């Protein structure tokens, strides 16, 4: 069975190997950038908290602003319906 194994260097030609290496390196660089951005976001939320803002609510506002307006309105209407049905509003 080992005789039938393809040596790893023969699996991809040199062009494909170069492309694969380039892709992997780009992803790795982006992962580093993502970590740096996440740290910056964390610092902004810490600053907001220091200024007396509720970070949990701020995160919710950011999440809501990302949503499509029509989809958000539909979800809000369904939420209101469900809350009304159980006597919460």
Swiss-Prot record:
Classification via HAMAP family: UPF0335
Entry's Gene Ontology molecular function annotations: DNA binding
Taxonomic superkingdom: Bacteria
Protein name, per record: UPF0335 protein CC_3319
Family statement drawn from the similarity comment of this UniProt entry: Belongs to the UPF0335 family.
Record-annotated membrane-spanning stretches: none
Source species of the chain: Caulobacter vibrioides (strain ATCC 19089 / CIP 103742 / CB 15)
InterPro entries the UniProt entry points to: GapR-like, GapR-like_DNA-bd
């Amino acid at each position: 069975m080992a005789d039938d194994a393809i040596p790893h260097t023969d699996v991809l030609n040199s062009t494909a190997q170069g492309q694969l290496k380039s892709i992997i390196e780009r992803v790795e660089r982006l992962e580093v950038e993502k970590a740096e951005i996440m740290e910056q976001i964390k610092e902004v939320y810490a600053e907001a908290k220091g200024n007396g803002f509720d970070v949990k609510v701020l995160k919710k506002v950011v999440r809501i602003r990302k949503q499509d307006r029509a989809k958000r309105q539909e979800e809000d209407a369904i939420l209101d319906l469900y809350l009304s049905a159980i006597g919460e509003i």
